[in-house]
């Protein structure tokens, strides 16, 4: 049984710090590289068409989503990468060097997404990938995101979910219970982290309830998009103009 528990956030912080350097390689192996396609789908749904804008990437990890976003836009973008794992942000900062000369700028913010250190109505769009199921109070993080988004701003959430198809459920559960922990142990020497991952997916609310939570936080015109038969889901929503 995993010793990590989202009701004890410091244990989750320790977990992500411990696997940060192996995180990208592990994600690629465990998702069969599908996560890159999913990240791009998320980016396409929230991409701003403004000439200059701000991106708030929550639970940013090593920056995959933020950098995928910036690769898709040519207009200057100020990207704020927020995570409570200092090791994850250090990996993101190192990865950003590969951009070389770019019109974009980056800021790395060590913070809890339930208490964002930004003023009201300062961000144009926000993303959160593979993070919300790890948050102790997910509604609070959504309300904070709503607070800092400008009117008309878009939120996009990408999360690992449970497929609805019964046959897919069987294969999914088998993978999570057997192969996932073994691969996680082999790649990171931290089997506990991937036991936690299995449990967090299994116990998290279904996509429909997550969409309702986004609405409860105040977002409108929400959308829900199933990926790979439901093993991942994108939820989008907009802050009203008034």
UniProtKB/Swiss-Prot annotation:
Pathway the protein acts in: Quinol/quinone metabolism; menaquinone biosynthesis; menaquinol from 1,4-dihydroxy-2-naphthoate: step 2/2
GO biological process: menaquinone biosynthetic process; methylation
Keyword check for Ligase: no
Keyword terms of this UniProt record: Menaquinone biosynthesis, Methyltransferase, S-adenosyl-L-methionine, Transferase
List of residues binding S-adenosyl-L-methionine: 62, 83, 112-113
Reaction it catalyzes: a 2-demethylmenaquinol + S-adenosyl-L-methionine = a menaquinol + S-adenosyl-L-homocysteine + H(+)
Pfam hit, one: Ubie_methyltran
GO MF entries: demethylmenaquinone methyltransferase activity
Record Gene3D superfamilies: Vaccinia Virus protein VP39
InterPro entries membership: SAM-dependent_MTases_sf, UbiE/COQ5_MeTrFase, UbiE/COQ5_MeTrFase_CS
EC number(s) on file: 2.1.1.163
Domain of life assignment: Bacteria
Family classification: Belongs to the class I-like SAM-binding methyltransferase superfamily. MenG/UbiE family.
Protein function: Methyltransferase required for the conversion of demethylmenaquinol (DMKH2) to menaquinol (MKH2).
Name under which the protein is recorded: Demethylmenaquinone methyltransferase
Source species: Protochlamydia amoebophila (strain UWE25)
């Amino acid at each position: 049984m995993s010793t990590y528990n989202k009701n004890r956030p410091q244990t989750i912080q320790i977990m992500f710090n411990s696997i940060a350097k192996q995180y990208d390689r592990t994600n690629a192996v465990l998702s069969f590289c599908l996560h890159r396609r999913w990240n791009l789908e998320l980016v396409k749904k929230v991409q701003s068409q403004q000439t200059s804008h701000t991106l708030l990437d929550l639970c940013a990890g090593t920056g995959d989503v933020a950098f995928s976003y910036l690769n898709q836009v040519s207009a200057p973008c100020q990207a704020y990468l927020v995570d409570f794992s200092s090791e994850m942000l250090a990996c993101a900062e190192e990865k950003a060097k590969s951009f070389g000369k770019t019109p974009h700028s980056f800021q790395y913010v060590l913070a809890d997404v339930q208490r964002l250190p930004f003023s009201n109505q300062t961000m144009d769009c926000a993303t959160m990938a593979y993070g919300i199921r790890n948050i102790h109070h997910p509604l609070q993080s959504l309300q904070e995101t709503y607070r800092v988004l400008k009117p008309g701003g878009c939120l996009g959430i990408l999360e690992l979910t449970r497929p609805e198809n019964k046959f897919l459920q069987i294969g999914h559960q088998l993978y999570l219970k057997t192969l996932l922990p073994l691969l996680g142990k082999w790649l990171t020497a931290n089997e506990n982290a991937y036991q936690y991952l299995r449990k967090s997916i299994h116990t998290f609310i279904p996509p429909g309830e997550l969409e309702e939570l986004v609405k409860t936080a105040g977002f409108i015109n929400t959308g829900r998009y199933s990926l790979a038969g439901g093993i991942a889901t994108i939820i989008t929503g907009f802050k009203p103009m008034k």
